[in-house]
């Protein structure tokens, strides 16, 4: 089988164009986002709205925390040089290649011909960026990865780890597809735990994301109980309350369930850690294991 091709979307040219005063919503749509049209189609997001101010790729990007030409150009002036300085534009290929090798070593040929990577500036004013120390990602559709970054000292050294996390999602979804409307809490905590443990395996514990909280024993036990009770809850809105915690749930209009920030991510991470010990499997092998088996072998909720 041919080697999986890694394509970087040329966001550098787009931001250069913006700095010269030539970037607009259409160049955002057709130069920066059109190469990922298949991903956006899966998410039911049109490149251009049929009516003025309608839902389209620009609005959806802003909801994800991505800078668009509707926002202040000063952000690009301030943040673009730092994004280049982070080194991620030189290192993205090595991250994905290293990830592919981890699976090929275990006999899993990822059933994709290519992966598109889009490294984007985040919007400083976005809540998404603020709650995640200025960076986030999306790897929910196999073959497409986005990283959104408002560069700072905390996140610049963690970008490779974040990219590895999103790559793991891509692989996981080729093995166990994900339905946003029908996902359970159990599936989501396993998914995020796998991705962060994979990133940790590749780049070290000191570079894991801020979405893994440092709970004390009491908080950990309480969170496990709440999630254990609600782990079969379904649907992205309800599940999000367990994953992101009460503050984010309230802001997004979901019913809070009594959890701290990022509780689902944190519990998922520790659940996978326990599974790896109990199963004696590698994180790549765990990524290719059904959710049900991971829960059972981890004995985390027993």
Language-model region placement:
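Auxiliary, metal-adjacent structural segments of Zn-dependent hydrolase domains
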Residues: 79-141
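Membrane-interface helix caps and helix-loop-helix hairpins in membrane proteins
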Residues: 178-180
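N-terminal low-structure segments adjacent to metalloprotease catalytic domains
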Residues: 1-88
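Active-site recognition of the HExxH zinc-binding catalytic motif
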Residues: 161-174, 192, 196
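Short pre-active-site segment immediately N-terminal to the catalytic Zn-binding motif
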Residues: 147-162
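Pan-zinc metallopeptidase signature
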Residues: 43-44, 230-302
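Hydrophobic/aromatic-lined pockets within catalytic cores
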Residues: 104, 168-176, 199-207, 272, ...
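Post-HExxH zinc-binding segment in Zn-dependent metallohydrolases
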Residues: 2-14, 183-225, 230, 301
